[in-house]
Structure formats: C-alpha cells, structure tokens
Amino acid sequence: MRIGHGYDVHRFCDGDFITLGGVRIPHKYGLLAHSDGDVLLHALSDALLGAAALGDIGKHFPDTDPQFKGADSRALLRHVVGIVKAKGWKVGNVDATIVAQAPKMAPHIETMRQLIAEDLQVELDQVNVKATTTEKLGFTGREEGIAVHSVALLLPA
C-alpha cells in the first residue's frame, strides 16, 4: 500500500469560468495556467504519481512543452492512471480539499466526484472532494487564486 500527497495552486486571471474536477464553473475570473488550469485534477495527479514514486505532473507534462498548451486535465489524469497501473498499482481511494473563497463549490462537488471516479476507473465511494475557505485570509481569502490539497491511496493491482 502506498500513500501520496498532491498540492497545486493557480492564480486567477481574466476570464468568466474556471474548470475544477472536470466541471466548468461560471466565475468572475479564469485560472492562469499552461493547461486548462484544473488545479483539482493537477493535485490529484500529483498525489497518484507521488504514491507510485513516479515524480510529479511537471515531469510528465512540462509547461515548457507546447503539446500541453491548453491540455484537458482529465486526459492528463487518465494518462497518469495508466502510468500508475503499468507500475502494478490500482487506486484505493482519493481525497481532495479545494481551498477557495469563491466561487462556491457545493453545487458542483457531486459532479466532480463522478467525473473523477470515471477517470480513475473506480467507484464513487472511493472519491471524496470537499471545499473550504480561509476566512478571507491569505491569497485564497483575497480571491487571488485557488489551492487544492489531495491524498491518494494506491494498492497492489
């Protein structure tokens, strides 16, 4: 059994939506990123790669590589799952915490869980996503960006 932790942050920029957990969410800002900016899926990918001792998403999908410009983070996550499975692991469960003052995540969390479970090829009860604020403290509290912490448990396949 292996445990990995993932963390990612993206700054807000001009835009009218963000993508989190594969869900397009209307917002007064977008997220600045080389890919689609899905900070949740990036943190989950890092947790999975970390648990399997396979580095991080920057190693596998460098932001200096033009082929990943605007990349769909769901496709990247599915690729990570393939790498992890090829090393003899399967997902036991994942848990993620979105840290954001806005937008409100509650209306979108179940859809995020469903899409993540689909991409990880696991049951819904193996995926947890929750959200919190920092009570208007720090960069997330000032609505400068979004952060996500995630944990993944891998089991021998």
UniProtKB/Swiss-Prot annotation:
List, in alphabetical order, the GO biological process terms annotated in this UniProt record. Answer: isopentenyl diphosphate biosynthetic process, methylerythritol 4-phosphate pathway; terpenoid biosynthetic process
Q: Which residues bind 4-CDP-2-C-methyl-D-erythritol 2-phosphate?
A: 8-10, 34-35, 56-58, 61-65, 100-106, 132-135, 139, 142
Q: Which InterPro entries match?
A: MECDP_synthase, MECDP_synthase_CS, MECDP_synthase_sf
UniProt cofactor(s): a divalent metal cation
HAMAP family in UniProt: IspF
Quote the record's binding site residues for a divalent metal cation.
8, 10, 42
Enumerate the UniProt keywords alphabetically: Isoprene biosynthesis, Lyase, Metal-binding
The entry describes its oligomerization and partners as: Homotrimer.
Recorded protein name is: 2-C-methyl-D-erythritol 2,4-cyclodiphosphate synthase
Please write the reaction equations for the catalytic activity of this protein. Answer: 4-CDP-2-C-methyl-D-erythritol 2-phosphate = 2-C-methyl-D-erythritol 2,4-cyclic diphosphate + CMP
Q: Tell me the protein family, please.
A: Belongs to the IspF family.
Pfam name, any one: YgbB
GO MF terms listed in the record are:
2-C-methyl-D-erythritol 2,4-cyclodiphosphate synthase activity; metal ion binding
Q: How is the cofactor bound?
A: Binds 1 divalent metal cation per subunit.
Provide the E.C. number(s) assigned to this enzyme.
4.6.1.12
Q: What does this protein do?
A: Involved in the biosynthesis of isopentenyl diphosphate (IPP) and dimethylallyl diphosphate (DMAPP), two major building blocks of isoprenoid compounds. Catalyzes the conversion of 4-diphosphocytidyl-2-C-methyl-D-erythritol 2-phosphate (CDP-ME2P) to 2-C-methyl-D-erythritol 2,4-cyclodiphosphate (ME-CPP) with a corresponding release of cytidine 5-monophosphate (CMP).
Which gene name does the record give?
Answer: ispF
**Which pathway does it serve?**
Isoprenoid biosynthesis; isopentenyl diphosphate biosynthesis via DXP pathway; isopentenyl diphosphate from 1-deoxy-D-xylulose 5-phosphate: step 4/6
CDD domains, per the entry: MECDP_synthase
